[in-house]
Protein backbone atom coordinates (compact mmCIF):
# COMPACT_ATOMS: atom_id res chain seq x y z
CA UNK A 1 0.00 0.00 0.00
CA UNK A 2 1.35 3.39 -0.99
CA UNK A 3 0.70 6.54 1.02
CA UNK A 4 0.43 9.55 -1.28
CA UNK A 5 -1.12 12.17 0.97
CA UNK A 6 2.08 14.11 1.67
CA UNK A 7 3.29 14.17 -1.93
CA UNK A 8 -0.09 15.38 -3.13
CA UNK A 9 -0.30 18.02 -0.41
CA UNK A 10 2.87 19.76 -1.52
CA UNK A 11 2.63 18.75 -5.16
CA UNK A 12 0.49 21.69 -6.17
CA UNK A 13 3.42 23.99 -5.61
CA UNK A 14 5.25 22.99 -8.74
CA UNK A 15 2.35 21.56 -10.70
CA UNK A 16 1.02 25.11 -10.91
CA UNK A 17 4.39 26.61 -11.76
CA UNK A 18 5.74 27.52 -15.19
CA UNK A 19 7.40 24.93 -17.41
CA UNK A 20 11.08 24.61 -16.49
CA UNK A 21 13.93 22.32 -17.41
CA UNK A 22 15.22 20.57 -14.30
CA UNK A 23 19.00 20.64 -14.10
CA UNK A 24 21.24 18.41 -12.05
CA UNK A 25 21.78 19.76 -8.55
CA UNK A 26 24.27 18.82 -5.85
CA UNK A 27 24.42 15.06 -5.36
CA UNK A 28 23.81 13.92 -1.82
CA UNK A 29 26.17 11.33 -0.40
CA UNK A 30 24.19 8.20 0.58
CA UNK A 31 26.90 7.22 3.05
CA UNK A 32 26.50 10.36 5.12
CA UNK A 33 24.69 9.63 8.36
CA UNK A 34 23.22 13.13 8.70
CA UNK A 35 19.39 13.13 8.54
CA UNK A 36 18.45 13.68 4.88
CA UNK A 37 15.67 16.17 5.51
CA UNK A 38 17.94 18.46 7.49
CA UNK A 39 20.54 18.08 4.74
CA UNK A 40 18.05 19.47 2.23
CA UNK A 41 17.47 22.54 4.37
CA UNK A 42 21.16 23.11 5.01
CA UNK A 43 22.15 22.73 1.37
CA UNK A 44 19.27 24.70 -0.11
CA UNK A 45 21.18 27.97 0.06
CA UNK A 46 23.88 26.52 -2.22
CA UNK A 47 21.59 25.65 -5.12
CA UNK A 48 22.07 27.62 -8.31
CA UNK A 49 20.25 28.32 -11.57
CA UNK A 50 17.06 26.57 -12.56
CA UNK A 51 17.23 24.13 -9.67
CA UNK A 52 16.96 27.17 -7.36
CA UNK A 53 14.01 28.47 -9.35
CA UNK A 54 12.21 25.17 -9.00
CA UNK A 55 12.61 25.02 -5.24
CA UNK A 56 11.80 28.74 -4.88
CA UNK A 57 8.57 27.98 -6.74
CA UNK A 58 7.76 25.32 -4.17
CA UNK A 59 8.44 27.68 -1.25
CA UNK A 60 6.51 30.55 -2.84
CA UNK A 61 3.33 28.50 -3.22
CA UNK A 62 3.68 26.47 -0.01
CA UNK A 63 5.40 28.88 2.43
CA UNK A 64 5.73 26.33 5.23
CA UNK A 65 7.15 23.57 3.05
CA UNK A 66 10.66 23.84 4.53
CA UNK A 67 9.14 23.41 8.00
CA UNK A 68 7.45 20.29 6.71
CA UNK A 69 10.69 18.99 5.22
CA UNK A 70 12.81 19.60 8.30
CA UNK A 71 10.19 18.56 10.86
CA UNK A 72 11.60 15.79 13.03
CA UNK A 73 8.90 13.86 14.89
CA UNK A 74 9.57 12.72 18.45
CA UNK A 75 10.72 9.10 18.71
CA UNK A 76 8.19 6.42 19.58
CA UNK A 77 7.69 5.75 23.25
CA UNK A 78 8.81 2.26 24.18
CA UNK A 79 9.48 0.01 27.14
CA UNK A 80 12.42 -2.33 26.54
CA UNK A 81 11.64 -5.77 27.91
CA UNK A 82 14.32 -7.52 29.98
CA UNK A 83 16.40 -10.22 28.35
CA UNK A 84 14.78 -12.79 30.65
CA UNK A 85 11.50 -12.44 28.73
CA UNK A 86 13.04 -13.71 25.49
CA UNK A 87 13.55 -17.37 24.62
CA UNK A 88 16.65 -16.72 22.52
CA UNK A 89 19.04 -13.82 21.93
CA UNK A 90 21.32 -14.22 18.92
CA UNK A 91 24.45 -12.05 18.99
CA UNK A 92 25.63 -10.85 15.61
CA UNK A 93 29.16 -10.31 16.93
CA UNK A 94 29.41 -13.99 17.85
CA UNK A 95 28.23 -15.09 14.41
CA UNK A 96 30.61 -12.72 12.68
CA UNK A 97 33.49 -14.20 14.68
CA UNK A 98 32.92 -17.71 13.28
CA UNK A 99 35.39 -18.80 10.60
CA UNK A 100 35.23 -22.02 8.58
CA UNK A 101 37.54 -23.75 6.14
CA UNK A 102 36.40 -23.85 2.54
CA UNK A 103 36.88 -26.54 -0.11
CA UNK A 104 40.02 -24.73 -1.23
CA UNK A 105 41.54 -25.05 2.23
CA UNK A 106 41.27 -21.32 2.85
CA UNK A 107 39.49 -19.99 5.91
CA UNK A 108 36.66 -17.50 5.54
CA UNK A 109 33.83 -16.19 7.65
CA UNK A 110 30.84 -18.49 7.91
CA UNK A 111 28.52 -15.69 6.79
CA UNK A 112 29.36 -12.33 5.26
CA UNK A 113 28.22 -8.84 6.17
CA UNK A 114 28.74 -6.44 9.05
CA UNK A 115 26.81 -8.10 11.86
CA UNK A 116 28.66 -7.05 15.00
CA UNK A 117 26.16 -4.30 15.92
CA UNK A 118 23.11 -6.55 15.52
CA UNK A 119 21.28 -8.83 17.94
CA UNK A 120 18.12 -10.86 17.34
CA UNK A 121 15.64 -11.38 20.16
CA UNK A 122 13.23 -14.30 19.77
CA UNK A 123 10.00 -15.04 21.63
CA UNK A 124 8.09 -18.31 21.19
CA UNK A 125 4.49 -17.15 20.78
CA UNK A 126 1.89 -19.37 22.40
CA UNK A 127 -0.61 -20.13 19.59
CA UNK A 128 -3.41 -20.37 22.16
CA UNK A 129 -2.74 -16.90 23.54
CA UNK A 130 -4.07 -15.05 20.49
CA UNK A 131 -5.64 -17.79 18.38
CA UNK A 132 -4.33 -16.35 15.11
CA UNK A 133 -3.16 -19.82 14.04
CA UNK A 134 -2.34 -23.16 15.64
CA UNK A 135 1.11 -23.43 14.05
CA UNK A 136 4.46 -22.72 15.68
CA UNK A 137 5.16 -18.97 15.84
CA UNK A 138 8.02 -16.68 16.79
CA UNK A 139 8.12 -12.92 17.21
CA UNK A 140 10.74 -10.45 18.34
CA UNK A 141 13.15 -7.73 17.35
CA UNK A 142 16.28 -7.26 15.32
CA UNK A 143 18.32 -4.75 17.32
CA UNK A 144 20.94 -2.51 15.74
CA UNK A 145 22.45 -1.39 19.01
CA UNK A 146 24.92 1.00 17.42
CA UNK A 147 22.20 3.00 15.68
CA UNK A 148 19.32 2.41 18.13
CA UNK A 149 17.13 0.59 15.58
CA UNK A 150 14.68 -2.18 16.48
CA UNK A 151 12.76 -4.06 13.76
CA UNK A 152 9.78 -6.20 14.73
CA UNK A 153 8.95 -9.50 13.02
CA UNK A 154 6.34 -12.26 13.38
CA UNK A 155 6.98 -15.74 11.96
CA UNK A 156 4.37 -18.44 11.22
CA UNK A 157 5.27 -21.99 10.31
CA UNK A 158 3.65 -23.67 7.33
CA UNK A 159 0.32 -25.38 8.00
CA UNK A 160 1.38 -28.21 5.71
CA UNK A 161 4.94 -29.56 5.98
CA UNK A 162 7.20 -27.06 7.76
CA UNK A 163 10.18 -29.41 7.64
CA UNK A 164 10.20 -29.20 3.84
CA UNK A 165 8.05 -26.25 2.78
CA UNK A 166 9.77 -23.01 1.70
CA UNK A 167 10.07 -19.82 3.76
CA UNK A 168 8.65 -16.50 2.50
CA UNK A 169 9.45 -12.98 3.72
CA UNK A 170 6.44 -10.68 3.23
CA UNK A 171 6.85 -6.90 2.92
CA UNK A 172 4.16 -4.26 2.70
CA UNK A 173 4.99 -0.93 1.10
CA UNK A 174 4.07 2.67 1.85
CA UNK A 175 6.85 3.50 2.39
CA UNK A 176 6.03 3.33 6.06
CA UNK A 177 3.21 0.75 6.22
CA UNK A 178 3.32 -2.22 8.57
CA UNK A 179 3.54 -5.73 7.16
CA UNK A 180 1.09 -6.75 9.87
CA UNK A 181 -1.41 -5.08 7.54
CA UNK A 182 -0.60 -7.79 5.02
CA UNK A 183 -0.91 -10.37 7.77
CA UNK A 184 -4.40 -9.41 8.93
CA UNK A 185 -5.89 -7.78 5.81
CA UNK A 186 -4.51 -9.95 3.04
CA UNK A 187 -2.55 -13.18 3.24
CA UNK A 188 -2.00 -14.10 6.87
CA UNK A 189 -3.56 -16.89 8.92
CA UNK A 190 -6.44 -14.74 10.22
CA UNK A 191 -8.25 -11.46 9.68
CA UNK A 192 -9.67 -9.16 12.37
CA UNK A 193 -13.42 -8.61 12.74
CA UNK A 194 -15.15 -5.39 13.78
CA UNK A 195 -15.44 -6.72 17.33
CA UNK A 196 -11.68 -7.41 17.34
CA UNK A 197 -11.91 -11.18 17.06
CA UNK A 198 -9.62 -13.28 14.88
CA UNK A 199 -11.22 -14.94 11.85
CA UNK A 200 -9.48 -17.96 10.28
CA UNK A 201 -8.24 -17.48 6.71
CA UNK A 202 -8.29 -20.72 4.67
CA UNK A 203 -6.35 -18.98 1.88
CA UNK A 204 -3.40 -17.89 4.00
CA UNK A 205 -0.06 -18.06 2.26
CA UNK A 206 1.25 -20.18 5.10
CA UNK A 207 -0.91 -23.01 3.71
CA UNK A 208 2.23 -24.37 2.05
CA UNK A 209 5.01 -22.05 3.23
CA UNK A 210 6.36 -20.60 6.45
CA UNK A 211 5.98 -16.81 6.39
CA UNK A 212 7.87 -13.97 8.10
CA UNK A 213 6.03 -10.65 8.39
CA UNK A 214 8.50 -7.80 8.96
CA UNK A 215 7.75 -4.25 10.13
CA UNK A 216 10.35 -2.20 8.28
CA UNK A 217 11.89 0.32 8.05
CA UNK A 218 12.22 1.36 11.69
CA UNK A 219 9.36 3.30 13.29
CA UNK A 220 6.81 1.30 11.28
CA UNK A 221 4.22 -0.79 13.14
CA UNK A 222 5.80 -2.29 16.25
CA UNK A 223 9.32 -1.30 15.13
CA UNK A 224 11.01 1.72 16.70
CA UNK A 225 14.17 3.82 16.78
CA UNK A 226 15.58 7.04 18.14
CA UNK A 227 16.65 7.84 14.57
CA UNK A 228 15.27 6.96 11.16
CA UNK A 229 15.87 5.17 7.89
CA UNK A 230 14.88 7.21 4.87
CA UNK A 231 16.07 5.29 1.84
CA UNK A 232 15.70 1.77 0.51
CA UNK A 233 19.41 0.94 0.36
CA UNK A 234 19.88 1.56 4.09
CA UNK A 235 16.87 -0.61 4.90
CA UNK A 236 18.36 -3.48 2.88
CA UNK A 237 21.29 -3.97 5.24
CA UNK A 238 18.93 -4.32 8.21
CA UNK A 239 16.87 -6.96 6.41
CA UNK A 240 19.98 -8.95 5.50
CA UNK A 241 21.09 -8.91 9.14
CA UNK A 242 17.68 -10.04 10.39
CA UNK A 243 17.50 -12.98 7.99
CA UNK A 244 21.07 -14.04 8.70
CA UNK A 245 20.55 -14.10 12.46
CA UNK A 246 17.12 -15.73 12.18
CA UNK A 247 18.40 -18.58 10.03
CA UNK A 248 21.40 -18.98 12.32
CA UNK A 249 19.03 -19.51 15.24
CA UNK A 250 16.75 -21.78 13.21
CA UNK A 251 18.92 -23.81 10.81
CA UNK A 252 15.97 -26.11 10.11
CA UNK A 253 14.43 -23.25 8.11
CA UNK A 254 17.72 -22.12 6.58
CA UNK A 255 17.95 -25.32 4.53
CA UNK A 256 14.59 -24.62 2.87
CA UNK A 257 14.08 -22.53 -0.25
CA UNK A 258 13.59 -18.86 0.59
CA UNK A 259 11.53 -16.28 -1.32
CA UNK A 260 10.88 -12.54 -0.89
CA UNK A 261 7.40 -11.25 -1.71
CA UNK A 262 5.73 -7.89 -1.27
CA UNK A 263 3.56 -5.25 -2.84
CA UNK A 264 3.45 -1.58 -3.75
CA UNK A 265 6.59 0.24 -2.53
CA UNK A 266 8.11 -3.20 -2.08
CA UNK A 267 8.75 -2.78 -5.80
CA UNK A 268 11.58 -0.58 -4.51
CA UNK A 269 12.50 -2.72 -1.53
CA UNK A 270 12.68 -6.17 -3.06
CA UNK A 271 15.25 -5.58 -5.84
CA UNK A 272 17.53 -3.91 -3.28
CA UNK A 273 17.02 -6.49 -0.54
CA UNK A 274 17.55 -9.41 -2.92
CA UNK A 275 20.66 -7.77 -4.39
CA UNK A 276 22.03 -7.19 -0.88
CA UNK A 277 21.59 -10.89 -0.07
CA UNK A 278 23.19 -12.05 -3.31
CA UNK A 279 26.14 -9.68 -2.78
CA UNK A 280 27.34 -11.90 0.08
CA UNK A 281 29.07 -15.01 -1.22
CA UNK A 282 29.06 -16.58 2.24
CA UNK A 283 25.43 -16.56 3.37
CA UNK A 284 22.89 -18.81 5.05
CA UNK A 285 19.93 -17.42 3.08
CA UNK A 286 18.81 -19.82 0.34
CA UNK A 287 17.16 -17.16 -1.85
CA UNK A 288 15.34 -18.78 -4.78
CA UNK A 289 12.97 -16.15 -6.18
CA UNK A 290 11.32 -12.76 -5.72
CA UNK A 291 7.69 -11.70 -6.22
CA UNK A 292 6.50 -8.09 -6.60
CA UNK A 293 2.77 -7.41 -6.47
CA UNK A 294 1.35 -4.18 -7.90
CA UNK A 295 4.72 -2.56 -7.39
CA UNK A 296 6.36 0.77 -8.19
CA UNK A 297 9.76 -0.09 -9.67
CA UNK A 298 10.33 1.87 -12.92
CA UNK A 299 8.46 5.20 -12.61
CA UNK A 300 9.64 6.49 -16.00
CA UNK A 301 7.81 3.64 -17.71
CA UNK A 302 4.91 3.34 -15.28
CA UNK A 303 3.77 6.97 -14.92
CA UNK A 304 2.57 7.31 -18.56
CA UNK A 305 0.06 4.52 -17.85
CA UNK A 306 -1.80 6.34 -15.07
CA UNK A 307 -3.89 8.33 -17.55
CA UNK A 308 -5.02 5.27 -19.55
CA UNK A 309 -5.94 3.41 -16.36
CA UNK A 310 -7.96 6.35 -14.99
CA UNK A 311 -9.60 7.11 -18.31
CA UNK A 312 -11.13 3.76 -19.24
CA UNK A 313 -8.33 1.94 -21.06
CA UNK A 314 -7.42 -0.57 -18.35
CA UNK A 315 -10.46 -2.82 -18.55
CA UNK A 316 -12.76 -0.78 -16.29
CA UNK A 317 -14.97 2.30 -16.89
CA UNK A 318 -13.30 5.70 -16.81
CA UNK A 319 -13.08 7.41 -13.44
CA UNK A 320 -12.08 10.84 -14.81
CA UNK A 321 -13.81 13.17 -17.25
CA UNK A 322 -12.23 14.19 -20.54
CA UNK A 323 -10.85 17.47 -19.19
CA UNK A 324 -9.03 15.73 -16.35
CA UNK A 325 -7.64 13.12 -18.70
CA UNK A 326 -6.37 15.89 -20.96
CA UNK A 327 -4.72 17.67 -18.03
CA UNK A 328 -2.80 14.48 -17.25
CA UNK A 329 -1.69 14.24 -20.88
CA UNK A 330 -0.59 17.87 -20.82
CA UNK A 331 1.47 17.38 -17.66
CA UNK A 332 3.13 14.14 -18.72
CA UNK A 333 6.05 15.56 -20.81
CA UNK A 334 7.25 17.73 -17.94
CA UNK A 335 6.80 14.87 -15.50
CA UNK A 336 8.86 12.52 -17.66
CA UNK A 337 11.63 15.08 -18.12
CA UNK A 338 11.85 15.39 -14.34
CA UNK A 339 11.99 11.62 -13.88
CA UNK A 340 14.71 11.40 -16.54
CA UNK A 341 16.73 13.97 -14.58
CA UNK A 342 16.23 11.89 -11.44
CA UNK A 343 17.36 8.73 -13.26
CA UNK A 344 20.43 10.58 -14.50
CA UNK A 345 21.63 11.92 -11.15
CA UNK A 346 19.74 9.83 -8.55
CA UNK A 347 20.03 12.95 -6.38
CA UNK A 348 17.40 14.25 -4.00
CA UNK A 349 17.69 17.63 -5.73
CA UNK A 350 16.20 16.22 -8.92
CA UNK A 351 14.24 13.24 -7.59
CA UNK A 352 12.23 15.16 -4.98
CA UNK A 353 10.77 17.72 -7.43
CA UNK A 354 9.94 14.87 -9.82
CA UNK A 355 8.04 13.05 -7.08
CA UNK A 356 6.09 16.10 -5.97
CA UNK A 357 5.22 17.34 -9.45
CA UNK A 358 4.32 13.98 -10.98
CA UNK A 359 2.29 12.76 -8.03
CA UNK A 360 0.23 15.93 -8.04
CA UNK A 361 -0.16 16.37 -11.80
CA UNK A 362 -0.46 12.72 -12.84
CA UNK A 363 -1.94 10.99 -9.79
CA UNK A 364 -3.63 14.01 -8.18
CA UNK A 365 -6.60 14.27 -10.59
CA UNK A 366 -7.67 10.75 -9.64
CA UNK A 367 -6.96 11.23 -5.94
CA UNK A 368 -9.14 14.31 -5.81
CA UNK A 369 -12.22 12.41 -7.06
CA UNK A 370 -12.60 10.57 -3.76
CA UNK A 371 -12.38 7.22 -5.54
CA UNK A 372 -10.28 4.44 -4.07
CA UNK A 373 -6.80 4.64 -5.68
CA UNK A 374 -6.27 1.00 -4.75
CA UNK A 375 -9.45 -0.18 -6.52
CA UNK A 376 -11.07 1.77 -9.37
CA UNK A 377 -14.39 0.03 -8.69
CA UNK A 378 -15.01 1.59 -5.27
CA UNK A 379 -15.08 4.87 -3.36
CA UNK A 380 -12.49 5.63 -0.69
CA UNK A 381 -13.69 4.82 2.82
CA UNK A 382 -11.99 4.87 6.19
CA UNK A 383 -9.49 7.72 5.82
CA UNK A 384 -6.54 8.25 3.49
CA UNK A 385 -5.90 4.53 3.07
CA UNK A 386 -9.53 3.81 2.14
CA UNK A 387 -10.10 0.60 4.13
CA UNK A 388 -12.07 0.63 7.39
CA UNK A 389 -10.53 -2.75 8.30
CA UNK A 390 -7.23 -0.98 8.98
CA UNK A 391 -8.83 0.70 11.98
CA UNK A 392 -9.91 -2.66 13.36
CA UNK A 393 -6.41 -4.07 12.87
CA UNK A 394 -4.84 -1.10 14.67
CA UNK A 395 -7.26 -1.43 17.59
CA UNK A 396 -6.50 -5.14 17.85
CA UNK A 397 -2.72 -4.65 17.77
CA UNK A 398 -2.93 -1.84 20.34
CA UNK A 399 -4.46 -4.14 22.94
CA UNK A 400 -2.18 -4.71 25.93
CA UNK A 401 -2.68 -8.46 25.91
CA UNK A 402 -1.72 -8.69 22.23
CA UNK A 403 1.40 -6.60 22.74
CA UNK A 404 2.40 -8.72 25.72
CA UNK A 405 1.90 -11.99 23.85
CA UNK A 406 4.13 -10.78 21.02
CA UNK A 407 6.75 -8.99 23.12
CA UNK A 408 5.98 -5.65 21.46
CA UNK A 409 7.83 -2.77 23.12
CA UNK A 410 6.19 0.36 21.69
CA UNK A 411 3.38 2.24 23.38
CA UNK A 412 1.20 2.41 20.25
CA UNK A 413 0.80 0.65 16.91
CA UNK A 414 -0.07 2.50 13.69
CA UNK A 415 -0.74 0.76 10.37
CA UNK A 416 1.15 3.45 8.42
CA UNK A 417 3.64 6.10 9.55
CA UNK A 418 3.38 9.22 7.41
CA UNK A 419 6.65 10.58 8.81
CA UNK A 420 8.47 7.63 7.19
CA UNK A 421 6.60 8.31 3.97
CA UNK A 422 7.76 11.93 4.06
CA UNK A 423 11.34 10.96 4.85
CA UNK A 424 11.59 8.65 1.85
CA UNK A 425 9.92 11.23 -0.39
CA UNK A 426 12.30 14.02 0.58
CA UNK A 427 15.30 11.74 0.27
CA UNK A 428 14.36 11.34 -3.38
CA UNK A 429 13.83 7.60 -2.97
CA UNK A 430 10.36 7.55 -4.59
CA UNK A 431 11.41 8.09 -8.21
CA UNK A 432 14.72 6.26 -8.29
CA UNK A 433 15.28 3.57 -10.96
CA UNK A 434 15.33 0.40 -8.90
CA UNK A 435 14.39 -1.65 -11.97
CA UNK A 436 18.06 -1.44 -12.96
CA UNK A 437 18.79 -4.12 -10.36
CA UNK A 438 16.30 -6.60 -11.81
CA UNK A 439 18.36 -7.91 -14.78
CA UNK A 440 21.05 -9.10 -12.40
CA UNK A 441 18.44 -10.91 -10.35
CA UNK A 442 16.80 -12.54 -13.38
CA UNK A 443 20.20 -14.02 -14.19
CA UNK A 444 20.21 -15.71 -10.77
CA UNK A 445 16.58 -16.62 -10.03
CA UNK A 446 12.94 -16.47 -11.20
CA UNK A 447 11.30 -13.04 -10.90
CA UNK A 448 7.51 -12.59 -10.82
CA UNK A 449 5.56 -9.36 -11.29
CA UNK A 450 1.88 -9.87 -10.49
CA UNK A 451 -0.80 -7.18 -10.64
CA UNK A 452 -4.44 -7.00 -9.69
CA UNK A 453 -6.08 -5.34 -12.67
CA UNK A 454 -8.45 -3.05 -10.72
CA UNK A 455 -5.65 -1.13 -8.99
CA UNK A 456 -4.94 2.44 -10.08
CA UNK A 457 -1.95 3.44 -7.97
CA UNK A 458 0.43 0.71 -9.21
CA UNK A 459 -1.70 -0.50 -12.08
CA UNK A 460 -1.28 -3.56 -14.26
CA UNK A 461 -0.76 -1.49 -17.42
CA UNK A 462 2.32 0.17 -15.98
CA UNK A 463 3.72 -3.04 -14.54
CA UNK A 464 3.26 -4.87 -17.83
CA UNK A 465 4.89 -1.95 -19.65
CA UNK A 466 8.05 -1.89 -17.54
CA UNK A 467 8.32 -5.67 -17.68
CA UNK A 468 8.24 -5.54 -21.48
CA UNK A 469 10.63 -2.58 -21.63
CA UNK A 470 13.25 -4.05 -19.30
CA UNK A 471 16.59 -4.50 -21.03
CA UNK A 472 18.24 -7.80 -20.17
CA UNK A 473 19.58 -10.75 -22.20
CA UNK A 474 16.17 -12.44 -22.39
CA UNK A 475 14.28 -9.27 -23.34
CA UNK A 476 13.38 -10.30 -26.90
CA UNK A 477 11.92 -13.66 -25.85
CA UNK A 478 9.88 -12.11 -23.06
CA UNK A 479 8.58 -9.29 -25.26
CA UNK A 480 7.51 -11.82 -27.89
CA UNK A 481 5.81 -14.17 -25.42
CA UNK A 482 2.00 -14.29 -25.53
CA UNK A 483 -0.35 -13.50 -22.68
CA UNK A 484 -2.05 -16.83 -21.89
CA UNK A 485 -5.04 -17.59 -19.71
CA UNK A 486 -4.20 -18.38 -16.10
CA UNK A 487 -6.60 -20.97 -14.71
CA UNK A 488 -7.06 -22.82 -11.44
CA UNK A 489 -5.74 -26.35 -11.82
CA UNK A 490 -6.08 -28.30 -8.60
CA UNK A 491 -9.23 -27.66 -6.55
CA UNK A 492 -13.02 -27.48 -6.83
CA UNK A 493 -12.70 -24.38 -9.04
CA UNK A 494 -10.53 -26.23 -11.58
CA UNK A 495 -10.67 -24.56 -14.97
CA UNK A 496 -11.73 -21.14 -13.65
CA UNK A 497 -9.89 -18.34 -15.45
CA UNK A 498 -8.31 -16.04 -12.85
CA UNK A 499 -6.10 -13.91 -15.08
CA UNK A 500 -3.37 -13.97 -17.69
CA UNK A 501 0.28 -14.90 -17.53
CA UNK A 502 3.26 -14.12 -19.72
CA UNK A 503 6.57 -15.88 -19.07
CA UNK A 504 9.94 -16.49 -20.68
CA UNK A 505 12.97 -17.90 -18.91
CA UNK A 506 13.19 -16.51 -15.39
CA UNK A 507 10.84 -13.55 -15.92
CA UNK A 508 7.05 -13.71 -15.50
CA UNK A 509 4.21 -11.18 -15.52
CA UNK A 510 0.68 -11.94 -14.28
CA UNK A 511 -2.52 -9.96 -14.57
CA UNK A 512 -5.03 -11.07 -11.92
CA UNK A 513 -8.66 -10.41 -12.81
CA UNK A 514 -10.75 -8.58 -10.24
CA UNK A 515 -7.86 -7.88 -7.91
CA UNK A 516 -7.10 -4.42 -6.61
CA UNK A 517 -3.84 -3.16 -5.14
CA UNK A 518 -4.00 -5.99 -2.59
CA UNK A 519 -4.68 -9.12 -4.63
CA UNK A 520 -4.89 -11.54 -1.66
CA UNK A 521 -7.65 -9.37 -0.14
CA UNK A 522 -9.79 -9.16 -3.28
CA UNK A 523 -9.00 -12.55 -4.83
CA UNK A 524 -7.82 -14.87 -2.04
CA UNK A 525 -8.36 -18.10 -3.95
CA UNK A 526 -6.52 -16.82 -7.02
CA UNK A 527 -3.65 -15.45 -4.94
CA UNK A 528 -3.04 -18.75 -3.15
CA UNK A 529 -3.32 -20.60 -6.46
CA UNK A 530 -0.56 -18.67 -8.20
CA UNK A 531 1.55 -18.53 -5.04
CA UNK A 532 1.52 -22.30 -4.52
CA UNK A 533 2.39 -22.94 -8.15
CA UNK A 534 5.12 -20.31 -8.15
CA UNK A 535 6.77 -21.85 -5.09
CA UNK A 536 6.76 -25.21 -6.87
CA UNK A 537 8.73 -23.64 -9.74
CA UNK A 538 6.08 -23.74 -12.47
CA UNK A 539 7.30 -20.55 -14.14
CA UNK A 540 11.10 -20.51 -14.34
CA UNK A 541 13.94 -21.08 -16.76
CA UNK A 542 14.30 -24.63 -15.41
CA UNK A 543 10.63 -25.50 -15.90
CA UNK A 544 10.55 -24.09 -19.44
CA UNK A 545 13.77 -25.74 -20.60
From Swiss-Prot:
Keywords: Carboxypeptidase, Disulfide bond, Glycoprotein, Hydrolase, Protease, Signal, Vacuole, Zymogen. The gene is CPYA. PANTHER family: SERINE CARBOXYPEPTIDASE CTSA-4.1 (PTHR11802:SF113), SERINE PROTEASE FAMILY S10 SERINE CARBOXYPEPTIDASE (PTHR11802). Belongs to the peptidase S10 family. This is Carboxypeptidase Y homolog A. Residues 18-123 form a propeptide. GO terms for molecular function: serine-type carboxypeptidase activity. Residues 1-17 form the signal peptide. The active site is at residues 264, 455, 517. It comes from the Eukaryota. It comes from Blastomyces gilchristii (strain SLH14081). InterPro entries: AB_hydrolase_fold, Peptidase_S10, Ser_caboxypep_ser_AS. Pfam families: Peptidase_S10. Disulfide bonds join 177-416, 311-325, 335-358, 342-351, 380-386.
